[in-house]
Swiss-Prot record:
Binds 5 Ca(2+) ions per subunit. Two of the Ca(2+) ions are bound to the C2 domain. This is 1-phosphatidylinositol 4,5-bisphosphate phosphodiesterase delta-4. PANTHER family: 1-PHOSPHATIDYLINOSITOL 4,5-BISPHOSPHATE PHOSPHODIESTERASE DELTA-4 (PTHR10336:SF31), PHOSPHOINOSITIDE-SPECIFIC PHOSPHOLIPASE C FAMILY PROTEIN (PTHR10336). Interacts with GRIP1. Interacts (via GBA motif) with guanine nucleotide-binding protein G(i) alpha subunit GNAI3 (inactive GDP-bound form); low-affinity interaction. It comes from Bos taurus (Bovine). The lineage of its organism: Eukaryota, Metazoa, Chordata, Craniata, Vertebrata. Ca(2+) 1 binds at D147, N149, D151, R153, E158. Residues 522-638 form the PI-PLC Y-box domain. Ca(2+) 3 binds at N306, E335, D337, E384. Residues 290-435 form the PI-PLC X-box domain. Its cofactor is Ca(2+).
């Protein structure tokens, strides 16, 4: 099967040496270092390993799983082993998603260079593969898995095993008939093109053929006019359909004569439907398409909570890898929890827990290196400063020396601003969000201060009433920084209000060290994002400025949305807000970010190390606009006079009816690859996330024993009150009557990026990785609800 990509795969001396194989040390920790024989397979797309050369090998990874290859010094683990192995002999393979990195140490610098250069060449090839090349690679991977004795050909017994691996339940007699038809050499085995023909016989699409014949006058081709009719009637392409039809024929018609005659064959039609142009996600939303010149507070900002953690909140590992992965997936606001460290060097970790420590300077170096690899729009450092004056000065030194010109240290024009700058204004800049020493003119009147104290006390009491068990040190109410008494008057009243209020039966925290005084040099680095305590919306309007930002626990934010959602919307129209998960989420679980986006909260911080529905929503929202990490909020969330209440939305919103016909599925993966004989019973669930009245879900019935090409043909109908805020999540599950249905794949996207018509939805894994070629085929139709229907 290696022939499928022959002539297209890059070939050089590095790859030839990799195909011969190399003994290298696989390193997991200081105590776990094992010699393994790694070899690039003949297909050029997979790497297998064995305990020794010639030993029984098993798959290690596919090139398509590799995100990048890093040199020795970029690995924390390899740096720690520098005395044992020369750094130049090591390298790190970084995978997409949440899969752990693979650290390897070669026997020589030359061998390490061979593998690094070869892998980088192959990763570049895979990144630029077209649709056909991706399918060829997928087929090659399956052939490798099915060819149990690795002789380059497949017997009927191996084909039967492969069918079960591919989720195909097929009558043995019919399968043998297809096998014999494909075996044109009559050798009793399938190889090369024969296997491809066998696969094609399995993947006939009668539902697409029926659709094709509906618009084709002769059932053989679509003329230009017939294709234009299809694009206008079904795909809702409007006036651009004529020009688009010519583009699509030129792009997807495999026959050169067909291109010249401006006709589309069945193969070309299917190619279009399976392509990005036939995807449910509108291709016009992929590039940067939104206005990026509005103030920062007008955007949703992709934000991370406890970015340094790659595990749970109590004993998990802290690593610069958390920052690298967050930034590379488009995150624009990262959290840095800084504490006094040994030898005068600040450290980053989750305070008062058993999580591991990392040097602050390593975190800053990683941020400086990766901040703008995915997006060149501004990165916000949300500093949680717990350091002494002396180590705060070290923080300032590392930030300024390592980040250099990337760090924003003064207002853009040198003048007092009247509103927050835009993402466009701040391209390539890193901003510090944190405490700032008060200026003389910012001091509050005693009456206002007393009112703030009372409101803060009420807020805290309400939070204790609703969550008496929430005693986590992550609570914002327990980590305030006292300002320098030499530069501003004491804040005794505020400190009293900010301390935990004791109640009968509640344990108090152990006594902590006196809180640190804020270093003026660190305060000076906070230019536009001064962190302030929230007391009430009235207090914020009367005493705060547009460049001040407040943080809210999820509990507090939910309470505010319920009690005064319209005021929260108005607040977020002129000031930035950050929402963070409850301290009770010690397992690094996530909340539903949608309810906070509904109120216009910009920085809804997520535990990005934890996959699941909540991260699917986050990835879905920020999939648009080039994945730059900034998404413009709807206009009614940018209006400081807005009357919109996320809990009770009313007109002038134009409600929409959404009609989804779930037609079929293609090449759905197994839930558990270890169960070769198990075949999934798939169903499709469509979930809507938006304002409370819009949040709902419906699902199809399940198809028994068919994950390869299930057919549903069922219609689901929804009524959406505020489509501007709606996210759609398509989930495929494996039905199980005895227990919870198992997850197979999902895809999430904003309503505003959804295309109508016949569309394929290309499924993603729990980690957000492509499950190509797994997809579901649907028909989407939206209709505006008439005033009569609404009344």
């Amino acid at each position: 099967m290696a022939y499928l990509l022959q002539g297209r795969l890059p070939i050089n001396q590095d790859l030839l040496l990799m195909q011969k194989g190399t003994m290298m040390r696989k390193v997991r920790s200081k105590s776990w270092k094992k010699l393994r024989f790694f070899r690039l397979q003949d297909d050029g797309m997979t790497v297998w390993h064995a305990r020794q050369a010639g030993g029984r090998a098993k798959p290690s990874f596919s090139i398509s799983d590799v995100d990048t290859v890093r040199e020795d010094h970029e690995s924390e683990l390899l740096r720690n082993l520098a005395e044992e192995f020369p750094l130049e002999q090591g390298f790190t393979i970084v995978f997409h998603g949440r899969r752990s990195n693979l650290d390897l140490v070669a026997n020589s610098v030359q061998e390490a260079q061979t593998w690094m250069q070869g892998l980088q060449l192959l990763v570049g090839f895979v990144t630029n593969m077209d649709q056909q090349e991706r399918l060829d690679q997928w087929l090659s991977d399956w052939f490798q898995r099915g060819d149990k004795n690795q002789d380059g050909r497949m017997s009927f017994g191996e084909v039967q095993r492969l069918l079960h691996l591919m989720n195909v339940e097929m009558d043995q007699e019919y399968a043998f008939q297809l096998f014999q038809t494909a075996d044109t050499s009559q050798s009793g085995t399938l190889e090369g093109e024969e296997f491809v023909e066998f696969y094609k016989s399995l993947t006939q699409r009668p539902e697409v053929q029926e659709l094709f014949e509906k618009f084709s006058s002769d059932g053989q081709k679509l003329t230009l006019l017939e294709f234009v009719d299809f694009l206008q009637e079904e795909q809702k392409e409007g006036e651009r359909a004529s020009d688009l039809a010519l583009e699509l024929i030129d792009r997807y018609e495999p026959s050169e004569s067909g291109k010249l005659r401006h006709v589309l064959s069945m193969d070309g039609f299917l190619g279009y439907l399976c392509s990005k142009d036939g995807d449910i996600f509108n291709p016009t939303c992929h590039p940067l398409y939104q206005d990026m010149t509005q103030p920062l507070n007008h955007y949703y900002i992709n934000s991370s909570h406890n970015t340094y953690l790659v595990g749970d909140q109590l004993c998990g590992q802290s690593s610069v890898e958390g920052y690298i992965r967050a930034l590379k997936r488009g995150c624009r606001c990262v959290e840095v929890d800084i504490w006094d460290g040994p030898s005068g060097e600040p450290i980053v970790y989750h305070g008062h827990t058993l999580t591991s420590r990392i040097p602050f300077k390593d975190v800053v170096a990683a941020i400086g290196q990766y901040a703008f690899q995915t997006s060149d729009y501004p990165v916000i450092l949300s500093l949680e400063n717990h350091c002494s004056w002396e180590q705060q000065e070290i923080i300032v030194r590392h930030l300024t020396e390592i980040l250099g010109d990337q760090l924003l240290t003064t207002a853009l024009d040198g003048q007092p601003p009247t509103q927050l700058p835009s993402p466009e204004d701040l391209r390539g800049k890193i901003l510090v969000k944190g405490k700032k020493l008060m200026l003389e003119e910012e001091e509050e009147e005693p009456e206002a201060e007393l009112e703030a104290e009372q409101e803060a006390r009420l807020d805290l009491e309400a939070q204790l009433e609703s969550e008496p068990q929430d005693l986590s040190p992550r609570s914002e109410d327990k980590k305030k920084v006292v300002m320098c008494p030499l530069l501003c008057r004491p804040l005794c009243c505020q400190i009293m209000a900010q301390a935990p209020i004791s109640k009968p039966g509640l344990l108090l925290f152990p006594k902590q060290k006196p809180k640190a005084i804020l270093c003026p040099a660190l305060s000076a680095l906070v230019v536009y994002l001064k962190a302030v305590t929230f007391y009430s919306f009235t207090h914020s309007r009367e005493h705060y400025h547009f460049y001040e930002t407040s943080s809210f626990s999820e509990t507090k934010a939910k309470s505010l949305i319920k009690e005064a959602g319209d005021e929260f919307v108005q607040h977020n129209a002129w000031q930035l807000s950050r929402v963070y998960p409850s301290g009770l989420r010690t397992d690094s679980s996530n909340y539903n970010p949608q309810e906070f986006w509904n109120a216009g909260c910009q920085m809804v911080a997520m535990n990005m190390q934890t996959a699941g529905l909540e991260m699917d929503l986050c990835d879905g929202l920020f999939r648009q606009n080039a994945g730059c990490g900034y998404v413009l909020k709807p206009d009614f969330l940018r209006d400081a006079q807005s009357s919109f209440h996320p809990e009770r939305p009313i007109s002038p919103f134009k409600a929409q009816t959404l009609i989804i016909q779930v037609i079929s599925g293609q090449q759905l993966p197994k839930v558990d690859n270890t169960k070769e004989q198990s075949i999934v019973d798939p169903l499709v669930r469509v979930e809507i996330f938006g304002v409370r009245p819009d949040t709902t879900r419906q699902e199809t019935s399940y198809v028994e024993n068919n994950g390869f090409n299930p057919y549903w043909g069922q219609t689901l109908c929804f009524r959406i009150l505020v489509p501007e805020l709606a996210l759609l999540r398509f989930v495929v599950k494996d039905y199980d009557w005895k227990s919870r249905n198992d997850f197979i794949g999902q895809y999430t996207l904003p309503w505003s990026c959804m295309q109508q018509g016949y569309r394929h939805i290309h499924l993603l894994s729990k980690d957000g990785l492509s499950l190509h070629p797994a997809s579901i085929f649907v028909h989407i139709c939206t209709q505006e609800v008439s005033e009569e229907a609404e009344s």
